């Protein structure tokens, strides 16, 4: 499927997505909706307050092959690819 369809599956159906050609085992992208989290860093605590909740906008996250999660932005190649698929967990 194309990226637009994959992105809609991630955003509206809460389905993890990946490209068929990705080499990393267990890698996938998922949508993280906007939310508020307790301030974690010194900067956030100074700006928003020690016990504040910081509002974050929605973003895409990548579960990488090393098991860590990172914010993710698609490359042009990712956006134009037609090899996206829904991942079964």
Predicted regions mapped to residue ranges:
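Glycine-rich, flexible loop segments associated with nucleotide phosphate handling
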Residues: 50-56
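Catalytic phosphate/metal-binding cores of nucleic-acid and nucleotide-processing enzymes, i.e., regions
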Residues: 3-45, 52, 65
């Amino acid at each position: 499927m194309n990226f637009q369809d994959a992105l809609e599956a991630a955003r509206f159906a809460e389905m993890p997505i990946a490209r068929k050609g990705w080499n990393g085992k267990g890698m996938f992208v998922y949508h993280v909706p906007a939310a508020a989290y307790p301030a974690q860093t010194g900067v956030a605590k100074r700006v928003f307050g020690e016990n504040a909740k910081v509002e974050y906008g929605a973003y895409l996250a990548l579960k990488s092959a090393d098991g860590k999660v990172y914010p993710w932005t698609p490359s042009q190649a990712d956006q134009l690819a037609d090899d996206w698929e829904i991942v079964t967990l």
